[in-house]
């Protein structure tokens, strides 16, 4: 299911092709049937007409596949792995899928040739497309004596692909916006910086920089480029390497390439194009540095020509008429420029970048139709600038390239956000006096560099200049960061003073006294009569009580009054000592708060000892007491754990229609710990996950309870997922969780054929190439499917929930819990969504960050987040590689989080106690400024890292942190199997400590 072919689109387009065999008989060369046969992969040209047509029909390119279309039948011939993806098209009786055997498909191809012969003697193919591979050889052999004549259908396919439907137009529009963004938001800024700073950068290197920008997934978000809610970066590709030209050498053909000459600050021409979901776009502009009047006048003519051509492109107009209108305009405005006008001023563009059968030139007689799209490429080639003093400015070219859509109302320019006006593309930097001064400085610099070369001949002057520039840039960046942080710290301290100006004393104020109330029995008649006959020590598990015989009467003590106990064997007797709670006792553990009593002046029994000869009975009683105490402690811990679990409203199911579904997804945490693929549904007010095993295994997540919704793509990961981080935890099974994740694995072992029988008969790498191609397709489809579903969730919530995607390029490795993982910033959070336990830290809740163990010689440092809610424990991310220190600082500065750094680990438990005790005094005394001071008075430990495999958190914070319920740390409770409550040995030690006796050693 990794490749999903749109059945409706396929049926519509194949019917269009079948109809065209009759309506455009001449364009298809009189063909009775059409064969689209693609052999083995490996051709670098994605615009081969056969592949373009197959992509248009299926949305994908299938290698080693034949597609025969006759007026009544559609037949696929492919291998078994690809046939699986085509099975969904067989719902229509006209569509057949034949599987070509592994050992050769001679008989199948002969059968296919026979079907083609039955349709007629003329078989339509794209004659110029040449493929190789076994399937091609087998079909050619089958045609040899069949009497079938091949006819060229390239013109017919051109007619077929000319008019675009709404989905195709949408893809071209997205590609056009992306191309324009790369031109205006990246190229222009970089180009001006290079020219202004007189940096040396070749056209080819500059082109590579633009090409690599495609990998920056945060580019469009950072530059506020709107590409639609369902846009996904993995569907975006370059149509060709960006073309950059300057310095007197220009080639305005689409086949031009960027040369190795350095960018020259004169006339600069840049054209680039991206394709989205296979649909192409193109945009190009000319930028002029210190242009002459003649250059400006010629450019104004080009702008006027652009408007004239747009007016001429109309439904029903011929391509040659558009070109002739352009020539007429030039003759009337600037006759001298006619000789420099390009011979072709555009072409049909779409899934094929340049349709060679539909060009806007003097020869093409094709008529323009509604819904068509064109690449309009206007330009004057190799003009002469006689006023230029620089030889590289003597020759120049001007170009304006746009992607347009044709409608009956006129032309819609899809790249209209690119600059066109003269004032937007011309720049003036410096006059002749400044040039002379700079030339003088250059000569002085050259002398210095010559001396340096004598000392280090292996380092060129260019390299040294580059290194000095980089050093200056780095220093400037550090200084800017320091200035920003200084302002952020001042703002933080002012905000703290304002926040706590009316707060006196402790932040949490007077804690409400909680008195535990418990009762064994309401009346003495409720005492179990069967336990009262012999007046011995008994345990009533049902009422959670210990019944003790005192003065000949049974006296019940609730298990909550029992503190600890011990059992001793002496001769024929066994002694049991029971210690009970009473006022004034010191808590046995630092974690335990002293118990509060309703009437501390009442009489209490602190301890009692029983002696008995009934050893077996007393052993059973003591064990029952021990087990009951453990169960009670565990129950109390679970109750405390569940205090913040809020009862959700009921999910309102969709009734009028079927809910939107995402099938075959796994959930984490899984109900009952079982990993089974289920279905995720979108209902009126939330999501529902349904398990296929048991209908009662449902997980409901309401939109109102979703704090953050993330889409994690497959790039660099083994899964793709939709992750919901919640405002309030929910119960899944019997465990509380702040995070619910729905995921699917990105790889499929079914594609791994290494080592099977196929190796005996195939010796090339065809299988590996196909497997890699399938893997890429699968990942692309998974990203597309999950991204689209996450956007549907956002839409269903009326945008109460926005989809956030982590920026992998900003990620850094660290240890938030026990494992070293990749933490990735998103727009609002710092997250780790792949390994459990998950980490989701909301940036808006952070007070400041502190970098620990930042000192020379250490390979790692630690990052601590302090929250605005000072009662929350701080979050540690340990063992971050030191080479990512600057990147982390830049990110913190970018998201406006004040940070500080120090050489050692701090005792954050003590620090936060001080802050909470009197926050007003804390901020009055300077607030967090002490973190930047070097102090030896702090109780600090200089060690490699406070992270140890055996601990989730630093030891010095255990006692202070357990009372808090961590929210955004998402500690993944569902992975823990630890038992709550103290064990009996610990209780025995406490009892011994109270009695002044040393604890007995175990044998």
UniProtKB/Swiss-Prot annotation:
Residues 468-486 have a biased composition (Basic and acidic residues). GO terms for molecular function: histone binding; histone chaperone activity; nucleosome binding. It comes from the Eukaryota. Residues 436-486, 930-1003 are annotated as: Disordered. The gene is SPT16. The keyword Nucleus applies. This is FACT complex subunit SPT16. Forms a stable heterodimer with POB3. The SPT16-POB3 dimer weakly associates with multiple molecules of NHP6 to form the FACT complex. One of its GO terms (cellular component) is FACT complex. GO terms for biological process: constitutive heterochromatin formation; DNA repair; DNA-templated DNA replication; nucleosome assembly; positive regulation of RNA polymerase II transcription preinitiation complex assembly; regulation of sister chromatid cohesion; transcription elongation by RNA polymerase II. Residues 440-450 have a biased composition (Basic residues). Residues 933-986 have a biased composition (Acidic residues). It is found in: Nucleus; Chromosome. Belongs to the peptidase M24 family. SPT16 subfamily. Keywords: Chromosome, Coiled coil, DNA damage, DNA repair, DNA replication, Nucleus, Transcription, Transcription regulation. Component of the FACT complex, a general chromatin factor that acts to reorganize nucleosomes. The FACT complex is involved in multiple processes that require DNA as a template such as mRNA elongation, DNA replication and DNA repair. During transcription elongation the FACT complex acts as a histone chaperone that both destabilizes and restores nucleosomal structure. InterPro entries: Creatin/AminoP/Spt16_N (IPR029149), Creatinase/aminopeptidase-like (IPR036005), FACT-SPT16_Nlobe (IPR029148), Fact-SPT16_PH (IPR056595), FACT_SPT16_C (IPR048969), FACT_SPT16_M (IPR013953), Pept_M24 (IPR000994), PH-like_dom_sf (IPR011993). Gene3D superfamilies: 2.30.29.150, Creatinase/methionine aminopeptidase superfamily, Creatinase/prolidase N-terminal domain, FACT complex subunit Spt16p/Cdc68p, Pleckstrin-homology domain (PH domain)/Phosphotyrosine-binding domain (PTB).
